[in-house]
């Protein structure tokens, strides 16, 4: 709701406290604010524009003349921060201490808003992020606000039906687990599950914790081929989580208009990706059929409309081809070749038409593994082959695409030197891990740099 608004206009900071405005004068105040915010000739620099646009839209006020968002700009300059309070930005970038508390603190900070804007704008220009800011990030602000306001319609009846199906599926899976273990126990209890797996069923102990046997996802994955109950337990965990987080969870956040209004966060991830919260609608697992069923409860607003799902084809590899300038990979894409089949043909030394689905699958793992900085050991684990075979696959790959290895090495060196890497549009991805004295953490940093 519209609570307080702080405005620096004509070198004067004003605080509008809407809670103190009586009903008689509230319409007049709203109309004055509307005239100010909708005046295109008054250029506006806003701290957290999406939030303000979202709030004002509810009061039928449009924001015109919005030229700069200090939060988004500060995020582009340093995406490693968790948040970007105005007084902190002024302290860090303008070397000014902002004094006071509450309203006084914010008003004192607002007094330096113009100076902060000029500093951030200059940094964005000097660091070559003007295209990224003005053509990508700034236009996105109003789009995200609109997305949040519209929301995503949900078929409540379908969701209720799904709740029944999940309850039945969970019950059925529980019975199968009990039958395989020949007793009932609390499957959700790591302690009880550990005793069943490692004492009663005598499965090999992979890892121990202070409280007993570890039964985390990594441990269960390694036990998959040891007993049929393990796969059932992994499935049970998936569907119970899906049920609590999405089936029951979504019921609680459906608004009066029949839609779910998630928040889309532009300044949270270090990579520039969006994040979704309250609830997270970007991470609904689709590995199992029950997960795919959840997506079907989302429907278009109009019955005559359809939901369209689009995805880039092999985008990571296309970007890699562009950034590395590897002629062989660029040529493969320009001739519309299936890059995974092409790689399989090279790795396994067979004609393209003789590449089997298994060969293509392994080549795909190599292609994407290289992008994410995979080691020969990890590749051997993923493909269930020897480390020597994995190393040979990677060697053949780099022989076929010679510029890629050099490019990836240069990216790692740049990250070590600068502490960050750059994307095509000069977005900075800060990687503090790469300067760690811990070898494992440093290796993670190198993979993140290539990623």
What do the PLM-derived regions correspond to, one by one?
Residues 22, 61-63, 96-104, 120-130, ...:
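Short, polar/flexible loop-turn hinges at active-site or ligand-entry regions and domain interfaces
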Residues 49-61, 71-80, 90-93, 195-201, ...:
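Short active-site loop/helix that positions an aromatic residue
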Residues 17-24, 67-111:
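Short alpha-helix plus adjacent loop in nuclease-associated cores
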Residues 42, 46-47, 56, 295-320, ...:
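Conserved catalytic alpha/beta cores of large enzymes that bind or transform nucleotide phosphates
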Residues 1-24, 28, 35-38, 47-49, ...:
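Conserved "right-hand" nucleotidyltransferase catalytic core of DNA-directed polymerases
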Residues 79, 187, 332-334:
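Conserved, non-catalytic sequence blocks in retroelement Pol enzymes and Pol-derived host proteins
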Residues 2-22, 309, 316-349, 433-436, ...:
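Metal-dependent catalytic core segments for phosphate chemistry
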Residues 142, 149, 261-262, 267-269, ...:
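Conserved catalytic core of nucleic-acid polymerases
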